[in-house]
Amino acid sequence: MRLVIARCSVDYVGRLTAHLPSAVRLVLVKADGSVSIHADGRAYKPLNWMSPPCVIAEADGVWRVTNRAAEQLVITLEQVLHDSTHDLGVDPGLRKDGVEAHLQVLLADRPDAIAPGLTLVRREYETGIGPVDLLCRDADGSTVAVEIKRRGEIDGVEQLTRYLVRLEADPALPHPVRGILAAQSITPQARLLAADRGLGCAVVDYDELRGLEPSIPTLF
């Protein structure tokens, strides 16, 4: 991971345009190829970012970050205060809570509950940056990566996107490769981002998968 703290301005050119005026910011360049710009606020959320895969061209204090859709982040560095690179190694990822772990087991037995025609290839398929929950095959023989969450949010979409970049480069897998975020509930923001990236969303019923009757209020 490369950490650059600099006074900079940022311009995004793509489906729309956006401009961040000059200020001191943190620029993160991760091993997966993503680039994000952060201020000293907004918790973990970046001011702007470019998801992998992308190409970074540096020249005369200007970074041009371009993705496959030809969208660009242009970062103009006026004063670099810090620039360092660190090898963080392979992250083991978050341990799933009890419900997520059980959902993974249940959906591995019933991948068709995610999408008709899915069959399981392997659970916990290693990508090099963490394991994708379920690696499946659809009726056409294409590879489908499934990330399972209790609640589907933007973080889950980002995680699945990173896995897909690795899987698309895996010559051992049948192509094309697509992804599905499966969860008990999925936020509108996550659905929008998933659709923008060509990912599928599947809402699964935990109780139904466990063979339980739905909870219906009664008078007695």
Curated annotation (Swiss-Prot):
It is an enzyme of class 3 (hydrolase). Belongs to the NucS endonuclease family. Keywords: Cytoplasm, DNA-binding, Endonuclease, Hydrolase, Nuclease. It comes from Frankia casuarinae (strain DSM 45818 / CECT 9043 / HFP020203 / CcI3). Cleaves both 3' and 5' ssDNA extremities of branched DNA structures. The keyword Mitochondrion does not apply. This is Endonuclease NucS. It is found in: Cytoplasm. Coiled coil: none annotated. One of its GO terms (molecular function) is single-stranded DNA endodeoxyribonuclease activity. Disulfide bonds: none annotated. One of its GO terms (cellular component) is cytoplasm. Its EC number is 3.1.-.-. It holds the Pfam family NucS_C. It comes from the Bacteria. NCBIfam families: PRK03298.1. Its main location: cytoplasm.
